[in-house]
């Protein structure tokens, strides 16, 4: 993938017979995806411009310039769309693009290495940070200020306050 690109949307199934497609936008404002100019595929080989967009249940329905039939739309199902990083707005304090977090080292508040950030997920109840340790299963933790008190992009790391359940601490009540 050409460097400096950020994934902002994924094309879904066709909608209707005139080439419209379902589009899942990964931007805070779903309609902002049409403000960034031409969107490109992961390999940079194809470029798309959004001609129109309207809101649907959990996605947008868009028409793309040059896509006029259902058959053309069907061939685009699953294509991820990217935009050059410099076209995105700057982040606010304590906001990050997921792409900036992937690959950062994860350390505990005591400075012990945990692994690397491999993904940020959102299953509907807030962001989840996925950390891959050098061995063993990955850790899935809430991406909150309580669990991730520090994100230091310049140092290339996130600091993790492991919940007691993960640290293996004993409960605060005696066993009966």
UniProtKB/Swiss-Prot annotation:
Protein biosynthesis keyword on record: no
Annotated GO biological process: ribosomal small subunit biogenesis; rRNA processing
UniProt superkingdom: Bacteria
Stretches assigned to the PRC barrel domain: 92-166
GO-annotated cellular components: cytoplasm; ribosome
GO molecular function, one term: ribosome binding
Main location: cytoplasm
Alphabetical keyword list: Chaperone, Cytoplasm, Ribosome biogenesis, rRNA processing
Places the protein is found: Cytoplasm
Quaternary state and interactors: Binds ribosomal protein uS19.
Entry comment, domain topic: The PRC barrel domain binds ribosomal protein uS19.
Family under the similarity heading: Belongs to the RimM family.
Record function comment: An accessory protein needed during the final step in the assembly of 30S ribosomal subunit, possibly for assembly of the head region. Essential for efficient processing of 16S rRNA. May be needed both before and after RbfA during the maturation of 16S rRNA. It has affinity for free ribosomal 30S subunits but not for 70S ribosomes.
Protein name (database record): Ribosome maturation factor RimM
